[in-house]
Amino acid sequence: TPNRDFMRF
């Protein structure tokens, strides 16, 4: 999910 992409930070 795209929401997980924000956790890449």
Swiss-Prot record:
<keyword id="KW-0964">Secreted</keyword>
<dbReference type="GO" id="GO:0007218">
    <property type="term" value="P:neuropeptide signaling pathway"/>
</dbReference>
<dbReference type="GO" id="GO:0005576">
    <property type="term" value="C:extracellular region"/>
</dbReference>
<keyword id="KW-0527">Neuropeptide</keyword>
<protein>
    <recommendedName>
        <fullName>CalliFMRFamide-10</fullName>
    </recommendedName>
</protein>
<comment type="similarity">
    <text>Belongs to the FARP (FMRFamide related peptide) family.</text>
</comment>
<keyword id="KW-0027">Amidation</keyword>
<feature type="modified residue" description="Phenylalanine amide">
    <location>
        <position position="9"/>
    </location>
</feature>
